[in-house]
């Protein structure tokens, strides 16, 4: 099942982007499977069914996709030398069966690939999945800020080629390079991050 889902709209001419995070437990109609949690779509039919589900739910065509898994995410982060960000509270969670041990102290932190993965995965606090979505957006903003540093800015097209090697996508190689160039020119004030609004509820005893 997909843990993080976002719908992005990129305007190459206006040099702007909008990123809408979709909480994984959002109840939607999955074609052929009825009303279920959004993240079930990927489990049932992979990226094609997830794309169809999101497109139907929001009434927009999904032209392209980017898919990153747990194994490749840390390697992508390490390509840019990790990310610096502020952690407002300690993130601590242990799942021995799942071989997961998250322990990120409060305060300003430098996150390498593995710690960055733990940061975006953590959801064991009062905000649950919404808190995780907020941290994922915080991380993405910090990563974009890192790419704006002079030593990385000129290398964005080159880095884009490296990163694409770890991503499953239907973008062509030339489109990936074009996207890298777009990120290079993108002003942080031209990126709008938002989270799909909703309210928590229980259906047949399941949240």
Regions found by a protein language model. Give the residues of each.
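Non-catalytic, solvent-exposed segments at the cell envelope interface
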Residues: 1-207
């Amino acid at each position: 099942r997909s843990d993080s889902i976002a719908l992005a709209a990129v305007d190459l001419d206006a040099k702007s982007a909008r990123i809408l995070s979709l909480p994984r437990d959002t109840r939607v109609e999955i074609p052929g499977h009825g009303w279920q949690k959004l993240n079930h779509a990927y489990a049932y039919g992979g990226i094609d069914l997830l794309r169809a589900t999101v497109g139907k739910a929001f009434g927009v065509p999904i032209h392209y996709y980017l898919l990153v898994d747990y194994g490749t995410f840390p390697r992508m982060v390490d390509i840019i030398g990790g990310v610096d960000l502020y952690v407002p509270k300690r993130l601590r969670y242990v799942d021995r069966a799942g071989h997961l041990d998250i322990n990120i102290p409060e305060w300003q932190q430098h996150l390498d690939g593995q710690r960055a993965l733990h940061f975006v995965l953590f959801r064991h606090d009062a905000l649950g999945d919404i808190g995780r979505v907020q941290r994922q957006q915080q991380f993405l903003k910090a990563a974009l800020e890192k790419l704006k540093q002079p030593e990385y800015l000129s290398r964005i097209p080159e880095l884009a080629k490296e990163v694409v090697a770890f991503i499953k996508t239907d973008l062509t190689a030339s489109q990936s390079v074009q996207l890298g160039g777009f990120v290079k020119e993108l002003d942080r004030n031209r990126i709008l991050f938002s989270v799909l609004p909703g309210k928590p509820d229980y259906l047949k005893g399941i949240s």
